[in-house]
Amino acid sequence: MTLGLINANPVVQAKKEGLVRREDQYRDDGVDPLEIYDYVRDIRDPEHPYTLEQLRVVSEESVTVDDKLDRILITFTPTIQHCSMANIIGLCLRAKLKECLQLHYKVDIRVSPGSHADEVSVNKQLNDKERVVAALENPNLRQLVDECIYSDEI
């Protein structure tokens, strides 16, 4: 047993090799859910050496894009209900999308309904601009977020 891990034995899925685009219903300058999923699926979990895709924290179905309103919604599912890393995972998702997307998109990041004991609190924190900026200005949190986002590049 590994000491210090909240979920010492997560369920790990096989990594998908390639993503197949569905019928293109999005305008030329817009994004589609598969593109967004492709941006975030390789983010490493802050607690385990696996990606969010491998742990099924994010999936293709968890991304919604409304190009007419320029809104993106990502719901993620922590591996356990009392996951202490849910806020970090949300910060990683937000930081990665901020890096990859045009500024005009409104991004909402939420934990899947019923998947976390502090769902309301986590959702509120992840979608409060001031809290997100403050968290990402913290050098220790920023380093952890960067390690998760760029783990395959380090």
UniProtKB/Swiss-Prot annotation:
One example of a Gene Ontology biological process annotation: protein maturation
InterPro entries found in the cross-reference section: FSCA_dom_sf, MIP18, MIP18-like
One matching Pfam family: FeS_assembly_P
Record-stated family: Belongs to the MIP18 family.
Purpose: May play a role in chromosome segregation through establishment of sister chromatid cohesion. Unable to complement ae7 mutants, and thus probably not involved in the cytosolic iron-sulfur assembly (CIA) pathway.
Record protein name field: Protein AE7-like 1
Source organism of the structure: Arabidopsis thaliana (Mouse-ear cress)
Lineage: Eukaryota, Viridiplantae, Streptophyta, Embryophyta, Tracheophyta
